[in-house]
């Protein structure tokens, strides 16, 4: 079973700035707070590209895990995606799509969480928490970017 979360927001910054912040994965812990992201490491040297490896450290509801991840999409100024899976089979997929919206940027954040059979009994508890966390994290991302006006 897959938990699906889709959140959209408008950010008062140009698309290139929003995209730059989305691909700055090592800063994810600064705004993916509700999702419990504590560290993200690029595994491969050099700039991120589709296929780049990531190691994502997360603590949620007292459960710490490391997801082995990969950048799935990297289209400058338009889309960024990643996926990861932990040792117990929990998988996560994030797809972010941005578009110019008047003088701002429209961001669509899609999250998919796949739970292995042994965790499916918790799905009804995890789904609303995941929705709330995504909304809070996207709001933190928006505030962070909009407060950086210079």
Language-model region placement:
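Hydrophobic ligand-binding cavity/cleft-lining segments
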Residues: 1-43
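Short, surface-exposed coil-to-beta transition loops
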Residues: 4-6, 64-68, 90-95
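Generic structural detector for well-ordered beta-strands
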Residues: 8-12, 70, 97
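Generic recognition of short, well-ordered alpha-helical interface segments
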Residues: 13, 23, 49, 66, ...
């Amino acid at each position: 079973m897959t938990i699906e979360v889709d959140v959209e927001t408008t950010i008062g910054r140009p698309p290139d700035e929003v995209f730059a912040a989305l691909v700055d994965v090592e800063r994810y812990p600064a705004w993916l707070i509700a999702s419990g992201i504590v560290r993200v490491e690029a595994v491969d040297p050099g700039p991120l590209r589709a296929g780049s490896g990531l190691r994502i450290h997360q603590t949620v509801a007292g459960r710490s895990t490391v997801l082995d991840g990969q950048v799935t999409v990297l289209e400058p100024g338009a889309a960024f995606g990643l996926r990861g899976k932990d040792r117990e089979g929990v998988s996560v997929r994030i797809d972010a799509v941005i578009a110019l919206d008047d003088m701002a940027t429209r961001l669509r954040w899609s999250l998919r969480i796949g739970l292995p059979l042994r965790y499916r009994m918790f799905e009804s508890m995890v789904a609303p928490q995941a929705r709330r966390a995504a909304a809070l994290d996207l709001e933190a991302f928006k505030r962070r970017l909009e407060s950086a006006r210079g």
